[in-house]
């Protein structure tokens, strides 16, 4: 009986350990793989601040370019492409969460006017589906269908992202109007430097937290360093922890000042934002314009014919 209880206890402990390990793996894996949109979605109700700044810039500190291309004008209830380009040197490698080097991922947030939204699959043409590839877009919030996020996705394959967008129809949507609208975009390549809680990632520079002499540098077994800084006046010691990834700039015995860089800046990525304008065009206005242009063409043709007729009359009178 005692043996059976012992085996039962061991079985429960093993099961509990496996469950905890799986939970940790899932949580950490999710936080790494879904870092870009998840951090913004969890921390901010709206990704664009009142100043016009997109909140991704709070974690991705380096400024890099991004480009967006949309049609100049679209008709109501029409599917069109919004192409976001996130350029970078494909040969670059970034510091991963485990300190190793790897390829860069990219991510983007697209802020559309109210009423514009992600096109349903049955409205997307085969040609557009081919451009989209295996990308999966999601709404920033269930109630904010006009704000779309994507990423992280492999940068080598998706440095150009095609969003399939459906324009609103003012005939059925009273909040939509035939106007010129702004579109905002933010795009990043690579990991961020700061987490939303304010802590640094291992993809940034680490500075000294005290002035003194570096008395000891210990390289950790799993990577990273412990740097002991000793105050030359009172002997007080401060230990700075460097995670795996950044390379050291300092050595033992070196004098150092407060906020002096201890490591290089390993970041090779960055964030950029841009904007574009699009006109929701009234079909009746287009028809009116076409009618006006057609009337001008016909008027020109009529004048040419009248001129030729007049010339013929003049020639006949001269011959007479």
Swiss-Prot record:
Cellular component, GO annotation: chloroplast thylakoid membrane
A GO biological-process term: photosynthesis
HAMAP family: Cytb6_f_cytF
Disulfide bonds: none
Leader sequence segment: 1-35
Membrane topology term: Single-pass membrane protein
The keyword Thylakoid is assigned to this record: yes
Record lineage: Eukaryota, Viridiplantae, Streptophyta, Embryophyta, Tracheophyta
Binding site for heme: 36, 56, 59-60
Record's subunit section: The 4 large subunits of the cytochrome b6-f complex are cytochrome b6, subunit IV (17 kDa polypeptide, petD), cytochrome f and the Rieske protein, while the 4 small subunits are PetG, PetL, PetM and PetN. The complex functions as a dimer.
Lineage: superkingdom: Eukaryota
A UniProt-annotated Pfam family: Apocytochr_F_N
Transmembrane segments: 286-306
Compartmental location: Plastid, Chloroplast thylakoid membrane
Cofactor: heme
Primary role: Component of the cytochrome b6-f complex, which mediates electron transfer between photosystem II (PSII) and photosystem I (PSI), cyclic electron flow around PSI, and state transitions.
Stored InterPro entries: Cyt-f_TM, Cyt_f, Cyt_f_lg_dom, Cyt_f_lg_dom_sf, Rudment_hybrid_motif
Keywords of this entry: Chloroplast, Electron transport, Heme, Iron, Membrane, Metal-binding, Photosynthesis, Plastid, Signal, Thylakoid, Transmembrane, Transmembrane helix, Transport
Organism name: Gossypium barbadense
Cofactor note: Binds 1 heme group covalently.
Name this polypeptide is given: Cytochrome f
């Amino acid at each position: 009986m005692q043996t059976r209880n012992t085996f039962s206890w061991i079985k429960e402990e093993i099961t509990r350990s496996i469950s905890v390990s799986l939970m940790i793996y899932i949580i950490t894996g999710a936080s790494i793989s879904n870092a870009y949109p998840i951090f913004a979605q969890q921390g901010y109700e709206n990704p664009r601040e009142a100043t016009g700044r997109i909140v991704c810039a709070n974690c991705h500190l380096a400024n890099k370019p991004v480009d967006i291309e949309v049609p100049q004008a679209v008709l109501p209830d029409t599917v069109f492409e919004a192409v976001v380009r996130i350029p970078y040197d494909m040969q670059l490698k970034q510091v991963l969460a485990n300190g190793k080097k790897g390829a860069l991922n990219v991510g983007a947030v697209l802020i559309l006017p109210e009423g514009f939204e992600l096109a349903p699959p049955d409205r997307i043409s085969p040609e557009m589906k081919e451009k989209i590839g295996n990308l999966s877009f999601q709404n920033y919030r269930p109630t904010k269908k006009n704000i779309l996020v994507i990423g992280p996705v492999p940068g080598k394959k998706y440095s150009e992202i095609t969003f399939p967008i459906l324009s609103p129809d003012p005939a059925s949507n009273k909040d939509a109007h035939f106007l010129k609208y702004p579109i905002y975009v933010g795009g990043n390549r690579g990991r961020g430097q700061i987490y939303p809680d304010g802590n640094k990632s291992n993809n940034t520079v680490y500075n000294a937290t005290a002035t003194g002499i570096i008395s000891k540098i210990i390289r950790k077994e799993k990577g990273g360093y412990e740097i002991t800084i000793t105050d030359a006046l009172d002997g007080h010691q401060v230990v700075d922890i460097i995670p795996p990834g950044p390379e050291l700039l300092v050595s033992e015995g070196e004098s150092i000042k407060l906020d002096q860089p201890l490591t290089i800046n390993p970041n090779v990525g960055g964030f950029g934002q841009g904007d574009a304008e699009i006109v929701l065009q009234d079909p009746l206005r287009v028809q009116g314009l076409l009618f006006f242009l057609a009337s001008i063409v016909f008027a020109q043709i009529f004048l040419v014919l009248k001129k030729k007729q007049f010339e013929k009359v003049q020639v006949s009178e001269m011959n007479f």
